[in-house]
């Protein structure tokens, strides 16, 4: 028993020494290989630093108006444990940003879908979202809690060499039909 405890202690000491060797970022956020393979790659392919141009549908239901844009940074957590992103919108007319937000995206192999937690400056707690990749390679996200009224969903379209697109839709008839209300175009930051 004493010999066993000695071996366990040595292993624990060597593990803690390894984790303590570098800055926290290099231990948790620098390795991306685990986010670029298997199902984690579904969101891993968005890892990078993106410049966002956005548009909102106006009340008339026809006219689109440009937004203030944003910066959106996706990173790999723990070499494949999760994908985390940081949403940093631009302020109006070059002013200070209104706040920031973050998603933590974790793949559940048992259900073959993503469990996503979103929170932001001035948000009332957290939002739980579920996501699943469709046959076209797009990722469709639905709110779980808090319940949204009207219902909404988000689609991440498969990325290309030039970036990727994203849309938010709302349903005004209980989910029968969906209307795009917000669109994003992401391009690599230069």
Task: Walk through the language-model features, giving the residues of each.
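Tryptophan-centered short beta-strand motifs
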Residues: 61-66, 95-97, 114, 175-180
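Helix-adjacent hinge/juxtasegments
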Residues: 90-125
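Short, hydrophobic/aromatic-rich segments at coil-to-beta transitions
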Residues: 47-51, 79-85, 111-116, 134-142, ...
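Bacterial N-terminal signal peptides
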Residues: 6-14
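Conserved Ser/Thr-centered positions that define the repeating blades of beta-propeller domains
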Residues: 169-171
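Short, surface-exposed coil-to-beta transition loops
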Residues: 67-71, 97-102, 124-128, 149-154, ...
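N-terminal glycine/threonine-rich, aromatic-flanked beta-hairpin/loop signature
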Residues: 65-100
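Amphipathic/hydrophobic helical signal segments and adjacent flexible N-terminal regions
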Residues: 2-4, 16-64, 189-190
């Amino acid at each position: 028993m004493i010999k066993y405890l000695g071996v366990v202690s040595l292993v624990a000491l060597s593990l803690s020494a390894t984790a303590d060797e570098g800055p926290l970022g290099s231990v948790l956020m620098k390795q991306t290989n685990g986010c670029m393979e298997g199902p984690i790659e579904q969101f891993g392919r968005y890892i990078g630093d993106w410049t966002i141009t956005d548009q909102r549908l106006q009340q008339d239901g026809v006219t689109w108006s440009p937004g203030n844009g944003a910066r959106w940074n996706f990173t790999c957590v723990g070499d494949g444990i999760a994908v985390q992103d940081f949403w940093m919108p631009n302020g109006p007319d070059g002013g200070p940003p209104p706040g920031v937000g973050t998603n933590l995206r974790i793949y559940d192999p048992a259900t073959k879908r993503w469990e996503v937690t979103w929170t932001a400056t001035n948000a009332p707690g957290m939002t739980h979202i579920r996501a699943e990749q469709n046959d076209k390679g797009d990722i469709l996200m639905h709110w779980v809690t808090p319940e949204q009224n009207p219902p909404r969903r988000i689609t991440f379209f498969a990325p290309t060499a030039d970036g990727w697109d994203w849309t938010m839709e709302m349903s005004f008839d209980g989910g029968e039909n969906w209307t795009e209300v917000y669109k994003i175009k992401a391009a690599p930051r230069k």
